[in-house]
Amino acid sequence: MRKPIIAGNWKMNGTIASGSILIEAFNSVLQDMELSCDVVVCPPFTAIERAVALTRNTAIEVGAQTMDYHDAGAFTGEISPLMLTEVGVNYVIIGHSERREYYGETDETVNAKIKSAFHHNLNPLVCVGESLEQREAGHTIDWITSQLKGALADIPKEQVSQLIIAYEPIWAIGTGKTATAEQAEEVCKAIRDYIRSLYDDDAADAVRIQYGGSVKSENALEILGEPNIDGALVGGASLVVDEFIDIIKAANQVSA
């Protein structure tokens, strides 16, 4: 059975001080829970080092929201995988739709970042998703498999099995709209089937697939109960203690 993973993407929210308060609140609740899921928080880069210190010897791991695929060089403003490993990061989000839209990231860029992440022993959390126009035109599956084809070029089976893929319909990110559990399951199953066609049953059965897109406590249990959904990439709700904890509890419940 695949272990669910709940990851909180704080985006460009929070300071070192406010992030510390959040993590301490999470710790105070989670220390009394027997977890059957992985929990990751992805603060802004300036707050990562403090987050790592606060989560040491706890159930929470720390991720970054993006990275460059170069180790060093004249890339003003970028953060390298070496910098992330130095501060103690274990996970990194790659290819989020906001990075693709606002910063021009392509499937080729995502592919280079995945390779670099694995090279530096970082766990890549790779985002894919369709626009509202693509969904309404019936192109969802074709678009997402196209994204995966580019992102996974020359990635060996052993690494794919360790991937986390997050299905985030662009039309549901930060809009309050959420795919139904049936819609989310349909796409996550298609992702798993595509991995099976590219690799084999072992790789498809091992890869963890999250749903992201306005996940809240009120819809988490239904979504996480679907057979091909192995967790959630949580945005705004990960900045609210009770909301994020309730989503973690939902993951615990379905994996018990």
Named regions from a protein language model:
Residues M1-A256:
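Active-site loop-to-helix "anion-binding N-cap" substructures in soluble metabolic enzymes
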